[in-house]
């Protein structure tokens, strides 16, 4: 008899990092995906990617949650159309030097809280999220200390049991994430990282620039279409 696998809830945005995390979870656990539509510019495109990735990897279920508070609060170029999404700095080294306008205030705490709630219901022991500190835009909710603090909150505020937050990519460089994804057979062709909602990725926002650079440094070809490379 095959041993019963631990269940894991994966925060699946549809982006490259969450896709690689999904591939890790599909390898190691019985995986369930949770996806959030929160008024972001790329809401529809991200949902298509998340569903496609979950299906390709054989996830048991995908829970799609709609959250209105970020759109109503505003303050981020991702949720407030009055704030332009900036192009990446001319000098790539400047990316992450300061918190950009694409930061959604305290977003990951809300995502994690919902994931923990569902994990309790499912009896899942793991929450997997694709936070990345290296080669990133400098978001404060993508640092190891943030997840260590949230782990303590889970242990304090949930019923008896053991739910752990896993951040398998947090210390990896982007090129290492690409290589890992290719090694695992992660469906990177289904992902979407761009902050634009156009048919093709813009190739000019910070997210696109970081992704394109990662594929180049990994000696690989990014399989998604770009308006500018």
Curated annotation (Swiss-Prot):
ATP binds at residues 12-22. Its cofactor is Zn(2+). GO terms for molecular function: ATP binding; ligase activity, forming carbon-nitrogen bonds; zinc ion binding. The keyword Nucleotide-binding applies. GO terms for biological process: queuosine biosynthetic process. Keywords: ATP-binding, Ligase, Metal-binding, Nucleotide-binding, Queuosine biosynthesis, Zinc. Belongs to the QueC family. This is 7-cyano-7-deazaguanine synthase. It comes from Acidobacterium capsulatum (strain ATCC 51196 / DSM 11244 / BCRC 80197 / JCM 7670 / NBRC 15755 / NCIMB 13165 / 161). The gene is queC.
């Amino acid at each position: 008899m095959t041993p019963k696998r631990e269940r894991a809830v994966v925060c699946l945005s549809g982006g490259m990092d969450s896709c690689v995390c999904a591939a890790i979870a599909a390898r190691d656990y019985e995986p369930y995906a949770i996806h959030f539509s929160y008024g972001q510019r790329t809401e529809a495109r991200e949902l298509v990617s998340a569903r496609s990735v979950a299906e390709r990897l054989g996830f048991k279920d995908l829970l799609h949650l709609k959250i209105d508070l970020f759109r109503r609060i505003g303050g981020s170029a991702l949720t407030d159309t009055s704030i332009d999404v900036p192009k990446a700095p001319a000098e790539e080294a400047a990316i992450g030097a300061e918190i950009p306008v694409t930061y959604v205030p305290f977003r990951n705490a809300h995502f994690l809280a919902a994931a923990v709630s569902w994990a309790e219901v499912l009896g899942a022991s793991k929450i997997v999220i694709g936070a990345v500190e290296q080669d990133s835009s400098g978001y404060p909710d993508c640092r190891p200390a943030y997840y260590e603090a949230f782990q303590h909150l889970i242990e304090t505020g949930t019923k008896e049991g053991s739910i752990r937050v896993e951040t398998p990519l947090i210390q990896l460089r982007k090129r290492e994430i690409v290589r890992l994804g290719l090694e695992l057979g992660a469906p990177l062709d289904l992902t979407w990282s761009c902050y634009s909602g156009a048919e093709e990725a813009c190739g000019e926002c910070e997210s696109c620039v970081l992704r394109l650079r990662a594929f180049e440094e990994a000696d690989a070809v990014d399989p998604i279409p770009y308006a500018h490379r």
